[in-house]
Design a protein with these regions (language model features):
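Intrinsically disordered, low-complexity, compositionally biased regions/tails
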Residues: 7, 15-16, 51, 130, ...
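Alpha-helical substrate-recognition element adjacent to the catalytic core
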Residues: 51, 57-135
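Short, strongly hydrophobic alpha-helical membrane anchors
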Residues: 1-7
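Non-catalytic pre-domain segments flanking phosphatase-related domains
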Residues: 10-11, 18-65
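C-terminal cap/substrate-recognition subdomain and adjoining C-terminal extension
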Residues: 114-200
């Protein structure tokens, strides 16, 4: 009798443990899905090529920011280079970020903001339009950034990206990174230098 009761007790504990594991797994999966949830029309756009207005002052400099190969090495999604971006933002108070990364195609603007430190989220002001469906895709990333900048009435902008082939040769706006390294101290210095040149 005691043995039977012991077996039932052990069985109950195992069942309860299994239930807890299932619930935890479901919660983890749900958080991942929400993090990269599909959003075809981000808040900034009413269509794939239409842009909303933004209150940009004459001193505003836009920073078009890629993620993979920039904020982290390759596509490991750790955002390990975020402290380097923080250095830039602290020294460049009129610099505002527009996300040009392909992450903008699968996340809302609010979702993208939550990837950044709280102190700088208000400086994430939008995303670039997607021109991937256009037949002529030469220098497509540059054209997306340029379209956004022109719509905003801003001619001072910097781009950080690891895919230089998406930009015209000698593009003065581009600060290129190595896909395997991401941002470095040299990237920080180059961005700050370009920012200071715009304001002088």
């Amino acid at each position: 009798m005691a043995g039977a009761l012991f077996s039932l007790s052990v069985g109950g504990v195992m069942f309860a443990t299994a239930v807890v594991i299932i619930i935890f797994s479901a919660m983890l999966y749900d958080s991942i899905v929400k993090r990269r949830s599909k959003n075809i029309n981000p808040p900034e756009f009413t269509g794939s090529h239409q842009l909303a207005s933004c209150n940009c002052s004459g001193g505003t400099v836009l920073l078009y920011l890629d993620f993979d190969g920039v904020l982290h090495r390759r596509m490991n999604e750790t955002f390990e280079r975020m402290p380097l971006l923080e250095k830039i933002l602290k020294q460049c108070p009129e610099l505002h970020i527009v996300v040009s990364s392909s992450w903008r195609e699968t996340m809302t603007l609010e979702g993208l903001k939550y990837l950044f430190p709280v102190a700088f989220r208000h400086r994430i002001i939008g995303v670039t339009p997607s021109l991937q469906e256009v037949k002529d895709t030469e220098y497509v990333r540059y054209r997306e950034c340029l379209l956004h900048a022109r719509h905003m009435g801003v001619n001072k902008f910097i781009i950080i990206d690891d895919e230089s082939h998406r930009f015209p040769p000698g593009c003065e706006n581009l600060v290129s990174t190595n896909y395997s390294e991401g941002m470095t101290d040299q990237t920080v210095a180059s961005v700050i230098m370009k920012y200071c040149q715009y304001l002088t």
